[in-house]
């Protein structure tokens, strides 16, 4: 269905942005716990991107590159670019890329929570679309994305709370 295609295509770009964010953890001096989380996100989402790209290829459908791209929407016959749910703006991405140490940890967790909530919205949109999400592979992928994101949001909220309650390091 169109809903399945939109989900698979959109989630490739969505996951690609999360991977870009996660790859900054080590060079930007993230804490060990944030680095571990970032590595987990990268591994899981790279595998899911490959699965989604193969699903589209198998159906001879256009396969988007695995890079963060805005979604094109037609409104009133005019193309509009907009970010998919939870996607970070260019300004947010620049802010995260420039952050270091504890500031990076705080921004990474805050923005990745926003990003993951957007993925949940995309799953809800898929399952709310007539006839979409019925195929076994798509149902399982979307269900896995939902479960993983809910679990990771809870983990990141705990990590953010711990970061906020910990005393900043002495200068």
Language-model segments: which ranges?
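All-alpha RGS (Regulator of G-protein Signaling) helical domain and cognate RGS-like helical scaffolds
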Residues: 1-171
